[in-house]
């Protein structure tokens, strides 16, 4: 868009006449009607009115917001012709415009060519913020140092421009230094500055420092609460999110969509369906459904808490569905082993003219894999490049290897890997290793393991997986070899844990842990269930029973299920969330227990959802 082709400088009378234009320009800028603001500016020039130092900041803001560098450069000429280049607010607007258009060198030139700039904190602040927005860490730090050396006062705006640079761990040292300078300079009473430091600490993983700063604040507004809640969520501290959310409500602060996205994500992580349902009702009653981010988080929460019907209901009533919404819903069906419905939704998306991206295809291929739709998955993989002109990435190749591997077509999976146009990465070899575990192919597993640890030598999961493959084949030498490798690397096996919700409280069970308040009752219930399972099996596999008793009887999902049976009404469904893949022994155990107690158990593990009912599992032993 071109602002104007010529600029005529008129008399003082014309400048006075510009005042009503300035009022309207300001209104349009405040309403974010930037295109209309530029059109009005052109009309202003055609009418013979001359812009002044009050006009330029608004129109420059419009050019910056629309990222119109050519129009911005033309305006710069108008500023010079109008003699306004020394006005502080015009200078600041020019610097900001160039920075927002990505022309940081031009912004720096404006700063350096105007001697007045080096005496004004607003000009320094504009340039520092611009460098930060363009990830120019060294330049921003240099300008800050220069600002202090020349005696220009550092204010809260300066800090708000600098702190976002320090939201990655490698620059946390700089952030701590800035925090110290804030305290020394008396800026630590500024709420906006403190909020930015809380966000910085949280994003850098320094959660305790962020929480300490939060606790020290005498007055906490919505933005402050959100900074800590979202920080906990980003660091995987779902328990803390829900606890702080309750404190926030008790303090009288009402949540907004940003709060709810973090809370819904935490409910999804923990499987806290009761709390999630309450938050879902709040979303509906407060009119947040049109917010696509909240609705997407609601879809994920309901689906990951086992309520796929409600997830679909939220999806269906969304007035506007983003590509992320479609991707999430398709992924939900895949996670629940309902790949056929996921593919129907994908077809519906295509018919509506929505173009898929790589992320959608990851979900579609994964859905095919978990539902045994091997040929359909192969067809879609070919269509990805042929029909949609999308180049497959490593994640798509690993999905296809998983697809073939789960179906037992291991030789085809290996041929596919060997024919890949790019070098297979760890995810590809890891998918093959997982398939070898399912189909007990030790020779191919050894090859896949050797390859995968070249890419991910510190991923303990692959060592555990290979050890289990050796265990299944009774290869004691192989087991010891893996243990030696793990010992040499000082690995510790990731502990398994499971969540189960009861009366709005989420209970955590660790494998082998006896710290829960009902541990004695839980273990008595577990003993009774194991006795019933042995009776049901007719002691047909006594040796296996002894092995299971000694190695897996205290796996976390068993403890969680026993707790759920103890604390719920007979016949009700029990939802358990596990961080690792359910082992084969526990999978068999849960199928048998579901028949004995006549219950449905819904278990979400690291792989998918399992619905145990009447002695069978929805995954058809295919996970």
From Swiss-Prot:
Residues 1-35 form a transit peptide. PPR repeats lie at residues 17-51, 52-86, 87-117, 120-154, 155-189, 190-220, 221-255, 256-290, 291-321, 322-356, 357-387, 393-423. InterPro entries: DYW_dom, E_motif, Pentatricopeptide_rpt, PPR_At4g14850-like_plant, TPR-like_helical_dom_sf. The keyword Transit peptide applies. One of its GO terms (biological process) is mRNA processing. It comes from the Eukaryota. One of its GO terms (molecular function) is RNA binding. It is found in: Mitochondrion. Residues 536-623 are annotated as: Type DYW motif. It holds the Pfam family E_motif. Gene3D superfamilies: Tetratricopeptide repeat domain. Residues 428-503 are annotated as: Type E motif. Keywords: Mitochondrion, mRNA processing, Repeat, Transit peptide. One of its GO terms (cellular component) is mitochondrion. Residues 504-535 are annotated as: Type E(+) motif. Belongs to the PPR family. PCMP-H subfamily. PANTHER family: PENTATRICOPEPTIDE REPEAT-CONTAINING PROTEIN. NCBIfam families: PPR. Involved in C-to-U editing of mitochondrial RNA. Required specifically for editing the mitochondrial NAD2 transcript. This is Putative pentatricopeptide repeat-containing protein At3g11460, mitochondrial.
């Amino acid at each position: 868009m071109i602002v104007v082709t010529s600029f005529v400088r008129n008399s003082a009378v014309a400048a006075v006449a510009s005042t009503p234009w300035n009022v309207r320009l300001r209104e349009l800028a405040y309403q974010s009607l930037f295109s209309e603001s530029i059109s009005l500016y052109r009309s202003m020039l055609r009418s013979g009115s001359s812009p002044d130092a009050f006009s330029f900041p608004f129109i420059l803001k419009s050019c910056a917001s629309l990222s119109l560098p050519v129009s911005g450069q033309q305006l710069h000429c108008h500023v010079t012709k109008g003699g306004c280049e020394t006005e502080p607010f015009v200078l600041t607007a020019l610097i900001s415009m160039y920075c927002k258009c990505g022309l940081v060198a031009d912004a720096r030139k404006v700063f350096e060519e105007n001697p007045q700039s080096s005496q004004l904190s607003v000009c320094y602040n504009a340039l520092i913020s611009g460098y930060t927005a363009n990830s120019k860490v060294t330049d921003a730090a240099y300008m800050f140092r220069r600002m202090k050396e020349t005696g220009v006062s550092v204010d809260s705006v300066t800090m708000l421009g600098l702190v976002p640079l320090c939201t990655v761990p490698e620059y946390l040292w700089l952030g701590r230094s800035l925090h110290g300078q804030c305290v020394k300079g008396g800026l630590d009473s500024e709420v906006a500055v403190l909020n930015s430091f809380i966000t910085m600490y949280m994003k850098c993983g320094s959660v305790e420092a962020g929480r300490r700063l939060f606790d020290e604040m005498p007055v906490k507004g919505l933005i402050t609460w959100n900074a800590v809640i979202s920080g906990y969520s980003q660091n995987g501290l779902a328990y803390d999110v829900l606890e702080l959310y309750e404190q926030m409500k008790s303090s009288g602060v009402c949540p907004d969509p940003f709060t709810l996205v973090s809370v819904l994500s935490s409910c999804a992580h923990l499987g806290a369906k009761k709390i999630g349902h309450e938050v879902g009702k709040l979303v509906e009653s407060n009119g947040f459904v049109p917010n696509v981010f909240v609705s997407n988080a609601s879809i994920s929460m309901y689906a990951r808490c086992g309520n796929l019907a409600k997830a679909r209901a939220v999806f269906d009533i969304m007035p506007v569905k983003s590509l992320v919404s479609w991707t999430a819903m398709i992924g939900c069906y895949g996670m629940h082993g309902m790949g056929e419905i996921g593919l129907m939704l994908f077809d519906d998306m295509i018919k509506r003219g929505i173009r898929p991206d790589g992320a959608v295809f990851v979900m579609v291929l994964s859905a095919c894999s978990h539902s045994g739709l091997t040929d359909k998955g192969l067809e879609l993989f070919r269509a990805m490049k042929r029909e949609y002109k999308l180049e497959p990435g490593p994640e798509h190749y690993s999905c296809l290897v998983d697809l073939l591997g789960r179906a037992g077509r291991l030789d085809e999976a290996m041929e596919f890997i060997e024919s890949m146009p790019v070098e297979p990465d760890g995810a590809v070899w890891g998918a093959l290793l997982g398939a070898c575990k399912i189909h007990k192919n030790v020779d191919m597993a050894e090859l896949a393991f050797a390859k995968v640890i070249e890419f991910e030598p510190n991923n303990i999961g692959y060592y555990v997986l290979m050890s289990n493959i050796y265990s299944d084949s009774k290869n004691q030498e192989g087991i010891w070899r893996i243990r030696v490798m793990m010992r040499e690397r000082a690995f510790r096996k990731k502990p398994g844990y499971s969540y189960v919700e009861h009366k709005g409280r989420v209970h955590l069970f660790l494998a082998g842990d006896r710290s829960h308040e009902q541990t004695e009752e839980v273990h008595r219930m577990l003993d009774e269930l194991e006795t019933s399972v042995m009776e049901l099996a007719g002691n047909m596999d006594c040796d296996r029973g002894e092995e299971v008793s000694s190695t897996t009887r205290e796996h976390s999902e068993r403890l969680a299920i026993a707790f759920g049976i103890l604390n719920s009404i007979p016949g009700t469904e029990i939802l358990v969330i596990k961080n690792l893949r359910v082992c084969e022994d526990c999978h068999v155990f849960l199928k048998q227990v579901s028949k004995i107690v006549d219950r449905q158990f819904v278990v979400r593990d690291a792989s998918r959802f399992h619905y145990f009912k009447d002695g069978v599992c929805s995954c058809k032993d295919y996970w």
